[in-house]
């Protein structure tokens, strides 16, 4: 597996964990973690950063707030 594919898989796992945090009532902490990860990925892996951006938007929907 390439490094990019590995990163993509890890990011998908991370996003699932963030969504579970949100479902468990800790959407604020999940958003903070997602924002930190987005900051790390945005320059070199913009596609993965965009996936995290989508997760942050999902976490801020009224059902998570």
Write out the residue ranges for each language-model feature:
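C-terminal-biased regions
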Residues: 1-65
């Amino acid at each position: 597996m390439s490094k990019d594919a590995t990163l993509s898989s890890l990011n998908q796992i991370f996003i699932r964990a963030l969504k579970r945090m949100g479902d468990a009532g800790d959407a604020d902490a999940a958003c903070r973690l997602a924002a930190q990860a987005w900051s790390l990925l945005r320059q070199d892996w913009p596609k993965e950063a965009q996936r995290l951006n989508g997760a942050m938007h999902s976490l801020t929907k009224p059902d998570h707030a």
